[in-house]
C-alpha cells in the first residue's frame, strides 16, 4: 500500500539511503497547464498589489524623491524575489509579458505556454489592482501607482529608459533561471539576482519614466483607476527591451551544451508502482 503523507512531513534524505530515490510523480498536460496558468495569475496578482502599493506607500510618507525611489525599488525587488521562490517551480514565475517574450525567443517556453501565461498575467494584474483599490482610502490611492513621466521628459526618452531597464532585467532572468536547466545551484541565487535587477531598474526610473519594467504592472492599475497617460510607452519599451535581451543572450552570451552518453552507464528504469511512500 502506498502511504500518502502531507508535504510538511517530507524529511527523507536520499544521501543517507542510496537504495532509494525521490521520484516526481507525473501529471497530465491539462493539470500542468492549469497549474501554470494559476501560478502566473496568482504571482502577477501579488506582484501588482505589491508594486502599486509600494508607490502609494512611498508617496504617503514624508521624504524626498530619492528616498521614495529607493523605498519603491526595495519593496518591488524584494516582492519579486519572494514570489519567484514561492511559485517558480510551476511556471517559472514570469509575471511579466516582457519576461515571457524573452523566454519565448530564447527557446525556454513554447508559443502556446507563452500565450496563456500572458493571459493569466493580464487577469492577475486586474485582480491585484482591484484588491489594492479596495485596501486603500481615496487619499492614498495615488492612481494605484500608475507611473507618470517627469516634467520635461518626453515619450521618446521614457521609451528608451523603459527599454534599457527592462533589457537588463530580462538578461538577468535569462542568465540565471534559464541556465538552471544545467546548474541547479543557481536556483538559490536566481530570485535574489532578479529581484536586485528590478530594484536597480525601479530606483533609476522611479523619478523619470516611473520605472515600470512590466506592461501589466501598469495595465491593471490603469484599468481600475482610469489613468492612461502615455500608456503605450510601458508596453513598447519593455517589449523592445525583451527582444534586445533575448537577441544578446542567444547570439552572444548563451553557452552551448551537448548531451552525450556516459560510457558503460545504464540509466535505471523507474516504476512508480514500487514506491514505498508518496508525498
Curated annotation (Swiss-Prot):
Keyword Transport among record annotations: yes
Transmembrane segments annotated in the record for this chain: 41-61, 70-90, 115-135, 159-179, 189-209, 228-248
Membrane topology category: Multi-pass membrane protein
Keywords, in A-Z order: Cell membrane, Membrane, Repeat, Transmembrane, Transmembrane helix, Transport
Gene Ontology process terms (BP): hypotonic response; water transport
Motif (NPA 1): 96-98
GO molecular function, one term: water channel activity
Keyword hit for Cell membrane: yes
Cytoplasmic side: 1-40, 91-114, 180-188, 249-279
GO cellular component terms listed in the entry, alphabetical order: plasma membrane
Motif (NPA 2): 214-216
Annotated function: May form a water-specific channel. Required for prolonged spore survival on fruiting bodies.
Family indicated by similarity: Belongs to the MIP/aquaporin (TC 1.A.8) family.
Domain remarks in the Swiss-Prot or TrEMBL record: Aquaporins contain two tandem repeats each containing three membrane-spanning domains and a pore-forming loop with the signature motif Asn-Pro-Ala (NPA). Here, the second motif is Asn-Pro-Val (NPV).
Entry protein name: Aquaporin A
Species the sequence originates in: Dictyostelium discoideum
Amino acid at each position: 500500500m502506498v502511504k500518502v503523507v502531507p508535504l510538511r512531513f517530507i524529511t527523507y534524505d536520499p544521501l543517507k539511503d542510496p537504495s532509494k530515490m525521490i521520484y516526481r510523480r507525473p501529471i497530465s498536460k491539462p493539470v500542468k497547464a492549469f497549474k501554470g496558468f494559476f501560478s502566473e495569475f496568482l504571482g502577477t496578482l501579488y506582484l501588482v498589489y505589491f508594486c502599486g502599493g509600494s508607490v502609494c506607500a512611498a508617496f504617503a510618507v514624508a521624504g524626498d524623491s530619492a528616498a521614495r525611489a529607493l523605498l519603491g525599488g526595495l519593496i518591488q525587488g524584494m516582492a519579486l524575489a519572494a514570489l519567484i521562490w514561492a511559485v517558480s517551480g510551476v511556471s517559472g514565475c514570469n509575471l511579466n509579458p516582457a519576461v515571457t517574450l524573452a523566454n519565448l525567443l530564447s527557446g525556454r517556453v513554447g508559443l502556446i505556454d507563452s500565450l496563456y501565461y500572458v493571459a493569466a498575467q493580464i487577469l492577475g494584474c486586474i485582480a491585484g489592482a482591484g484588491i489594492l483599490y479596495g485596501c486603500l482610502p481615496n487619499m492614498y490611492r495615488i492612481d494605484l501607482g500608475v507611473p507618470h513621466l517627469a516634467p520635461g521628459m518626453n515619450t521618446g526618452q521614457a521609451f528608451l529608459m523603459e527599454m534599457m531597464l527592462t533589457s537588463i532585467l530580462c538578461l538577468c532572468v535569462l542568465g540565471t533561471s534559464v541556465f538552471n536547466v544545467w546548474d541547479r545551484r543557481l536556483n538559490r541565487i536566481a530570485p535574489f539576482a532578479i529581484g536586485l535587477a528590478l530594484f536597480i531598474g525601479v530606483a533609476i526610473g522611479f523619478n523619470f519614466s516611473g520605472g515600470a519594467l512590466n506592461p501589466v504592472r501598469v495595465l491593471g492599475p490603469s484599468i481600475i483607476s482610469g489613468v492612461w497617460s502615455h500608456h503605450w510607452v510601458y508596453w513598447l519599451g519593455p517589449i523592445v527591451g525583451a527582444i534586445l535581451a533575448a537577441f544578446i543572450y542567444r547570439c552572444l552570451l548563451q553557452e552551448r551544451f551537448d548531451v552525450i552518453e556516459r560510457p558503460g552507464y545504464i540509466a535505471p528504469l523507474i516504476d512508480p508502482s514500487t514506491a514505498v511512500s508518496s508525498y
